Amino acid sequence: MHLVRWLICLIQLWIQLGAAGSVTLLDPLLIEIPNGKLRGRDNGHYYSYEAIPYAEPPTGELRFEVPKPYKQQWTNTFDATQPPVLCMQWNQFINGTNKLLGVEDCLTVSVYRPKNSSRNNFPVVANLHGGAFMFGGPSQYGHENIMREGSVILVTIGYRLGPLGFVSTGDADLSGNFGLKDQRLALLWIKQNIASFGGEPENILVVGHSAGGASVHLQMLREDFSKVAKAAISFSGNSLDPWVIQQGLRGRAFELGRIVGCGQASDSVTLKKCLKSKPAIEIVSAVRSFLVFSYVPFTPFGPAIESPDAPEAFITHHPIDIIKRGKFSQVPWAVTYTTEDGGYNAALLLEKQASSGRELIVDLNDRWFDWAPYLLFYRDSMTTIKDMDDYSRKLRQEYLGDRRFSVESYWDVQRMFTDLLFKNSVTVSVDLHRKYGKSPVYAFVYDNPSEVGVGQILSGRNDVYFGTVHGDDVFLIFNVSFVPANRRPDEEIISRNFIKMLEYFALSTDDTMAYGDCVFQNNVGSKHMQLLSITRDGCENKQLNFFI
C-alpha cells in the first residue's frame, strides 16, 4: 500500500515538472524542443546545454540576409555538450598581427540552469555580449558567477559581427543590421523554448554590456520587444552613444568591396553578389584596413538606419526620433556607466611603442586633428574639415587647456573619452525616456576600481591608476579570464548584489528594481535625474540636473 502511494506521489510530481517544461525528474540533461531531443552536461552545481542552433547557418546565399529560423529535425539526440563557437571576427584583444577568430556558422544559444532543490522554475537572464559590434562572443562572458548563486537561468547568444553582421549600403539591397536581426530571432527562440529548460517565459530579463548594452536598447526601441522580454538593462552602452549609429557606412561597404576584389561593383546588388562569393576570412580580415592605428576606430562596422522597404527592416529612424515619437516598447529599462568608462579605448594610448619606447599619447600632440575624429567618432558627422578641426580644437581646450598630451595629462584624456563615448548619452537617453516613455527608467553609476581591468590590458602596464573603467561592474557578474579569480571581499559582496539585482528585476511584479538595500528611483515623472551610486561602501540614491 505504501509503495502504491509512493508511486502515485512520484507520478504527480513528474506531471507537475512536466507541466513546467521538459526537464524530467529522471534525466534533467535530456530536453525536448520542437527540433527534437538534446542532451546537456552535468557540471556539478548546474546543468549546461550549449551551442544549440536557433538559425540556419548564415553562409552561402544566406550571407548578408535576414536570419532564417532553424528548422532541421534531429533524428538522433543533439549533443549540447560542446562549447559555443565564436562568430568570425577581427578581435582587438588578440596579440599579434593576425587577430582572426571564429567561424561563419555560429548562430547558437547556450542555456545554463542551476541545480536548486528549492525551486523547479527560474527567471531568465538573456545576455547580449559586448565587443564593439566587432568581436567577442558568448563564451567570453563566463556563467560561473551566476550559476554559483543558483537563482536564474542564463542564456547566452551568438550573433554576426563586423562586416558579416553589419555591412550596409543604406538601401534595401544590402540593408545591414544582420547581427541585430540575429539577436531578435534568438530572443524569440528563448521566449518559445525556455520553458523546456525550466525557465519562466513570462520573466525574461535581457541584459548587455557595451555594444551588448546598445543592442539591448536598440531591441527595446522596437514596439514588439515586450513580446519577448519583461525588462532590460544596458550596461555602459546605449543606442545614443556616438559609436553606435554612424554615418559613412555606405562608403565603407564599397571600400570593403574594393579591398576584397569587388571593386567593379557600382551598385548594392552587384556588391552584395560579389561579397557573397568571397571567402569569409577575406571579408573579416579586411577590417584591418579600416583601422587608423591599433584598433581605432573600434567600431568601423555597426548598426545602420535602414530603408523602410528593406526586408524585415530592424530600425528605420534614428533612435532619438523613435523615442520622441514614443514608438518603442514600454518595458522597464535601466542604463548605466562607470566613472571611468573611457578607459576603453583611451588606455591604449599609454601603450609604449616598440620602436620608440614612448607612449602613443605623446603622438597626439602632432596627430590630434588626424586621430581625434576616429577616436571619438565624429569623422563622418561633420560637414567640412574645418568643422571637424574646430570641434577637435574645442575638445582639447575644454579638457586639457594649454597642456600637452602626456602620461601626466592622461586622466583628463580618459575623462574626455568617458564623457563623449559613454556618460553623456546616459543623461540624454534617460531624459528622453522620462519625457516620452511611460515605463520606469532607472540609472546607476559604478565606482569601485578592479585590481586588473581593461585599462591594464589595453596599455600593457600596471603602474597607472585608471579608476573604475569599462567592464569593472559587469565582470563581477560575468567572469572573464583576465580578471583575477580571487576577488576582494567587497567585490564578492557587490557580485552577489548585482546577480540578486538581476533576479529581483526579472521577477518584479511592480516594475521596481533594487540593489542591496537600495531601491532604484524612477526617472519617469521626475524633474531631476535619479541616479543610484554604487561603490565598495554600499549604495546611495542621488539627484542630478538634466544637462550635459
Swiss-Prot record:
GO terms for molecular function: carboxylesterase activity. CDD domains: Esterase_lipase. One of its GO terms (cellular component) is extracellular region. Its EC number is 3.1.1.1. Residues 1-19 form the signal peptide. It is found in: Secreted. It catalyses: a carboxylic ester + H2O = an alcohol + a carboxylate + H(+). Disulfide bonds join C87-C106, C262-C274, C518-C539. It is an enzyme of class 3 (hydrolase). Glycans are attached at N95, N116, N479. The active site is at S210 (acyl-ester intermediate). Keywords: Disulfide bond, Glycoprotein, Hydrolase, Secreted, Serine esterase, Signal. The keyword Cell inner membrane does not apply. InterPro entries: AB_hydrolase_fold (IPR029058), CarbesteraseB (IPR002018), Carboxylesterase_B_AS (IPR019826), Carboxylesterase_B_CS (IPR019819). Its main location: secreted. Belongs to the type-B carboxylesterase/lipase family. This is Esterase-5A. It comes from Drosophila persimilis.
